[in-house]
Amino acid sequence: MTFVILMYNIIRKIYIKIILEGNCVIKVNDNEKLNYYISKYNLDEIFSIDMKPHMELVMFNKNEHICKSGETISYLFFLVHGKAKVYISLSNGKSLLLCFNKPLKVIGDVEFIKIDTADSNIQVIENAYCVVIPLEKIRQYALDDSKFLRYISNSLGEKLTKISKYSSINLLYPLENRLASYLLATASSDNSEISGLTNDCNLTEMSELLGTSYRHLLRTLNKLYDRGAIKKNKDIYEIIDVRILEDLAGDLYE
């Protein structure tokens, strides 16, 4: 009994739920893991001054949002582990997929510049870690830091370059190519089980994200099934030939 209580207290000290950007996320009080990600991605070299005291590690569980459209962003996020999908909410109530984020990706750089609310939704598709810094601290210590501003400028430039690509994907690429890219991006780490393809509700959401109809999505899934790329095991779709999907997907949504 004493051992159980001891382990509970240790876990409680390491993982503390906090409210971040309106969401209940998990703050990870693990300096070793935090320092690992800082070192892995050289986050301490982004700034001319030492910003490590202001860095924290947070964890998002699968399907939680890092940010939502219209919400104020108070932190600069560095996605250091996991994958997230970026999509916009349209005036007709539907959503449209833009891309997928993988490490290292900066989130909140646009809002840092324009001091405004988020204009897109970012939802993790697997458990993810982010190193976060309060924007208040960045504006206090790094607003005139040329090294940091150069890094942010590069990040914004990269996003601007990709905007034209994202905007043309739904117009120029057939659904089969876009679906193949989506399936690869949302697959589990061993490229077997496909996340989010478990019921009609998820398929409806996916059809909206890919800018197509529910029926067209089903027809295209059946085409991939006939080609031997995927199979359906009860309510779960599985990838059985990654190469077929990779040939179709190219670098869409990357």
Residue ranges of model-derived segments:
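Cyclic nucleotide-binding regulatory module and flanking cytosolic helices
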Residues: Y8, I14-K62, N101, V106-I107, ...
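Cyclic-nucleotide recognition modules
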Residues: F47, L97-G157, T161
